[in-house]
Amino acid sequence: MSDYKSTLNLPETGFPMRGDLAKREPGMLARWTDDDLYGIIRAAKKGKKTFILHDGPPYANGSIHIGHSVNKILKDIIVKSKGLSGFDSPYVPGWDCHGLPIELKVEQEFGKPGEKFTAAEFRAKCREYAATQVDGQRKDFIRLGVLGDWSHPYLTMDFKTEANIIRALGRIIKNGHLHKGAKPVHWCVDCRSALAEAEVEYYDKTSPSIDVAFRAVDQDAVKAKFGLPGVSGPVSLVIWTTTPWTLPANRAISLAPDFDYALVQIDGQAVILAKDLVESVMQRIGAAEYTILGTVKGAELELLRFTHPFMGFDVPAILGDHVTLDAGTGAVHTAPGHGPDDYVIGQKYGLETANPVGPDGAYLPGTYPTLDGVNVFKANDIVIELLKEKGALLHVEKMQHSYPCCWRHKTPIIFRATPQWFVSMDKEGLRQQSLKEIKGVQWIPDWGQARIESMVANRPDWCISRQRTWGVPMSLFVHKETQELLPIERTLAAMEEVAKRVEVDGIQAWWDLDPKEILGEDADQYEKVPDTLDVWFDSGSTSYSVVDARPEFAGHAADMYLEGSDQHRGWFMSSLMISVAMKGKAPYRQVLTHGFTVDGQGRKMSKSIGNTVSPQDVMNKLGADILRLWVASTDYTGEMAVSDEILKRAADSYRRIRNTARFLLANLNGFNPATDMVKPEEMVVLDRWAVGCAKTAQQEILKAYEAYDFHEVVQRLMRFCSVEMGSFYLDIIKDRQYTAKADSVARRSCQTALYHIAEALVRWMAPIMSFTADEIWGYLLGEREKYVFTGEWYDGLFGLEENEEFNDAFWDDVRYIKDQINKELENQKANGIKSNLEAKVTLKYADDANGTIKKLKLLGEEVRFIFITSQFVISEQAGGIDDENIQYNAGNTTVQAVVTRAEGDKCPRCWHYTTDVGKVAEHADICGRCVSNIAGNGEQRKFA
């Protein structure tokens, strides 16, 4: 017997079966860097329509975690897919470099500013620390395969950016949005600084819950309001609070104007509280017997005065819309220095904004003898004892409730009125204009719109001043006596002068500045404001300080901001506020948010639980492309689950896609697209169907990329590789590829299809599996650019026409019939028919057969290649189908498949069973078809 292996067209490629990504990817990255791939892409896309995804700056502190990876990979997928869609999509990564976390790190190592180092030296240490953090994070982001201008990122501590942040504040001042006030702000006593909304987290805390009686100053006047002069005992208004430490700052009691308030007689006294809460309050204070003497509307009690239980002054009853019946007594303890609602109502009534608490959280001297110098959280017990002594405490109990805490220290914070600078939400219509602008933005997912609308509608003025060392200075001058801001025109001119100096020397230029250099003779009357800007102002102003300033953005506004869902109250909010305050318009056209990462059981990532997934570990074990594929295949609109098992599934999907690509490349062995391409009209019908299948898949994949629906991209890609190609087309063509004459139309037609499919597939993969796409690109044939990322989606696909006889609908039916026959072939393994090629299939049909069955007959001898059997007979069954073997419906036609053993002998070359093996003397071992392919003109294929 001759060895016919050398006569076969066996697949061959240098593209490895195993990805071995962890080892190969670093080498590819080195080539990308050496070639300046990002620069090559920018040059290739020059002059195209722009798409700008503006990078929200991560904080320059610590190693990147899995959430960072999700964020950067999603951005990279979008930027690369936009490039393939014909856009010039520059990506400039950034970092947030000022602020408290960096200060704390430097303090831990070197001490507080002014101890071992001057403030100037401390800032230099902070700058140095931030730079090292940026370098560390940058290496990891690059390792993820994220393409961007990593050599020229933006840092909020860049001198030019710092200067532009000052200029942004100047524009906001010019537009009338800045004001100064002693308003209550979130205050962390550990940071000794105000906190932004986005720096506040909520945790459960146990606090004392107390009911306190404020005795009426004019008892008769209060009784008269209820028309009950003969009430027994004193009358008091009862408040409820969970922050007893704020009582020294109480300046009023708020009532709802339309609620009914009851005068209730209990043991030897009468108390006033909301009628609807009488029963719950009486149960709470243990009053088994009580009588409601009368009721009046809250409005009737306005401006009646009540004695503070221990502070020695009286306070008014006032009316406010913030009073509810959800809990308490319906009478709200009001301390304008310790709460935003209290402050607003206090302004309306001209109340004092009292703040008896220092920056360290201790009462200031002169507050109250037993409270002076005591930390407010330790003062609750002292206040409760005071109330007991004064006979004003009706009830005390412990309750657990959600309480605001510092994001950095995880410790409870307080509201504390301090002199601060604010961006006003309403003075110049910032709130209304922002709400208007929100409606013009596309929010993805769409629930993001309602979320940020609610936040903007309800947020207080934005406190932008901080009492920190490492931050952009506000660069303002105020009068030493009046504390009034330098006149507006002079303020703006002075700020520009400061900005010019900062542009050269950084923020230290402000602290080194002698006011005389700018203010001249007036310097004696004015002093520099020592405050720095909230870091959310730094990052929030990047639409101006970065996007407007970078030449590659060419004056275009950002098309997209993309961050985690917590940024509605963070970067999306601050960016919106600043852009609208400066320019009257939103800084973005689209805002996309992704969920947080959780483990396989849906639990939050936590080092203490030990369920964190390190992106560095994943890249070192599996490779970045597996991490990228996991991100793309996960629905980012909700929580994103990740675990070793989930990543293993991503690796399995990756292998299926890689194997498909390898099959395509291996079977393009010996194909030259310049000389061997077959014209579409001359191709085998099945090959044209396969190219058309790729065309349909491409339309759906591009639509999904356009909608940022990346898990749909992956699902469609998998369906194409596994179902349409792997289990149908690629399986069928193996016989033709391997056994047909090497340069026959039958084989070249197939290779033409594989070439077109490979050209499309590598581009679909590129935004997601960037390393693997680059690797495949290097093995593709024909003249091409060096990198897949510089081109666009493949435009050489075509398909079958709908009016053709063997159109897509026909092949859909064929795939269905093939699936059913494969099930029967599987069943026959028990009867000794071990492989499809050992089988003969007889397809019987009734005389009412539909067009698909009749068309199958037209395929003649080629039909067996579709079903991968040695023989395939289609036979009309007179009198209908019996119930023997398998029956199923194919397009309203009942057909029956009968599987028997194939006739003849096995050909050692093609492995088909046939009755003509050995009929040609010169090739006595093989079948006639193989003889033709070796020594003759080669078999002709028209359909399959």
Curated annotation (Swiss-Prot):
SUPFAM superfamilies referenced in this protein's UniProt entry, alphabetically: Anticodon-binding domain of a subclass of class I aminoacyl-tRNA synthetases, Nucleotidylyl transferase, ValRS/IleRS/LeuRS editing domain
Identify the residue span(s) of motif 'HIGH' region.
58-68
Keywords carried by this UniProt record: Aminoacyl-tRNA synthetase, ATP-binding, Cytoplasm, Ligase, Metal-binding, Nucleotide-binding, Protein biosynthesis, Zinc
Q: Specify the enzyme's EC class, one word.
A: ligase
Provide the binding site for L-isoleucyl-5'-AMP.
563
Q: Does the keyword Protein biosynthesis apply?
A: yes
Protein localization: Cytoplasm
List ligand-binding residues for ATP.
Answer: 607
- Subunit note: Monomer.
Matching NCBIfam families: ileS
Q: What name goes with this protein?
A: Isoleucine--tRNA ligase
**Which species does this protein come from?**
Salmonella paratyphi A (strain AKU_12601)
Q: What is the lineage of its organism?
A: Bacteria, Pseudomonadati, Pseudomonadota, Gammaproteobacteria, Enterobacterales
The gene from which this protein is expressed is ileS
